[in-house]
């Protein structure tokens, strides 16, 4: 699967990417939740992103405050900023079926990127521990 493409021309694609970052922020900030952002908002966000992304952004502001690691918090803020900047000047009010597919693609590709970034951070930590033990 390809990774997130910040140069993709579809605003719907970047809306999906923003959704993925919001979900990742919640996952890091709150380990045990009854219903995730994705479970609650994915369907409506993929149809009416202008309405839903504002609500999710408010939740993410709260979740970001809960992330104790300042470096990690800034990484997520920067990723979220990149996704929103790539949307352009207007968040689409509604999405056609084709645009919903681009939303899903952006969501999945950003999830892949975020997981890859996380795996790289874990690998660096493991390597640092190995170096210290030698």
Regions found by a protein language model. Give the residues of each.
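Intrinsic-disorder/low-complexity detector
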Residues: 1-134
